[in-house]
């Protein structure tokens, strides 16, 4: 298949044809979560966005090594160089070991990702497991003159780097702007410049997580982990680095600076960023206190939710917008997504009820849908356009089911194949099990109603109807027992 995939490169600010450095191999690194709390809708978006990319690249025949890290050390409060480590703080408040906090929330993150049908990455490295690599990175930057030691900590010299290179090329900022918007915080006097960022921090006596280094017992700066682990697993140069748009500055800007300062050039060819989930126009996030975690969505337990929403409803809701567009949360939007997904799912089920005719009449464009979906995917993963084409296909199916059109066996198989490929394999949607409480309650009411009709038939000595209801239910797996008070039943699974 000819490669026509274009992706928006944040670095060049334009769509570019995707050309892997070492085809058919593709290296992709995505910033994963800092595991000090439950994953929320904002965490679901990058996971789903880059899951789509992973799935599509794999479908196109590439051998993708997908690395998504786990931040379990070094991420300080407010994404700054001072303050308490987010995980260490949670551990202190909960009276747990930091790695207990990490493991608990990592297990819950994995469970949520599995529910959302997000494929696991090829490698999921932990920052705490790569301290040696991060120390080696800091040593290289020091050796090349772009960092300095101060009171046991090591800082990146942004001004020195900017003289030789361009600090701010990813975010479009210049150093003067950065300096004017960087606050001088207490305890930052050891920095030469407020814009300098920590590569290694000397740990205070109360800091739980610490490792020996040439400079002090301490811990790596937040930005080091991705540069070090990206290099370890994908090499000095790799294809794609992704993450949320909120990471462009400072995190990814600092990653580029670290890469250039340590090895002389940028490691990454394409930088990709998904936009934010918002609530009333404000970014959803733990630090804003306005987030709804995924478990609350799945069970409808948050005060802002009017009902529970299934994992596939959440996935479909996110895919209805292009990954570079903002998505504003509302119950109305989620309910519309729920209904839309149900329409598509019912249409796919309807395919199995269609008897093919000798030719297709009354509908046009069956064979064009596949190419249209490919065109949309190749246009920077334009999932909302793919979904629009799937709805076109659903309308064709419903027209045939309503006996207003006919479809040939060849076109019927094409629709089945096209829906399976784009809806399930590439967009990663799936049919959800119908054994939830709402469905079970509905089934129970129907069975009770039938058995009440059977009781009336027995009372009227209509044995034929009574036996027919019992036998039909038995054929469906329902075991019915008559009692002196009426009846009991159970479903034999």
Swiss-Prot record:
Q: Quick check: keyword S-adenosyl-L-methionine in the entry? A: no
GO biological process: one example: cysteinyl-tRNA aminoacylation
Write down what this protein is called: Cysteine--tRNA ligase
Q: Which amino acids does the record list as binding Zn(2+)? A: 31, 226, 251, 255
- Cite the cofactor comment: Binds 1 zinc ion per subunit.
The residues the record assigns to binding ATP are 286
Cellular component terms, GO, for this chain's entry?
cytosol
Ordered alphabetically, the record's keywords are: Aminoacyl-tRNA synthetase, ATP-binding, Cytoplasm, Ligase, Metal-binding, Nucleotide-binding, Protein biosynthesis, Zinc
- EC code: 6.1.1.16
Q: Which gene encodes it?
A: cysS
Q: Name one GO molecular function term.
A: zinc ion binding
Q: Which reaction does it catalyse?
A: tRNA(Cys) + L-cysteine + ATP = L-cysteinyl-tRNA(Cys) + AMP + diphosphate
Kindly state the positions of the motif 'HIGH' region in this protein: 33-43
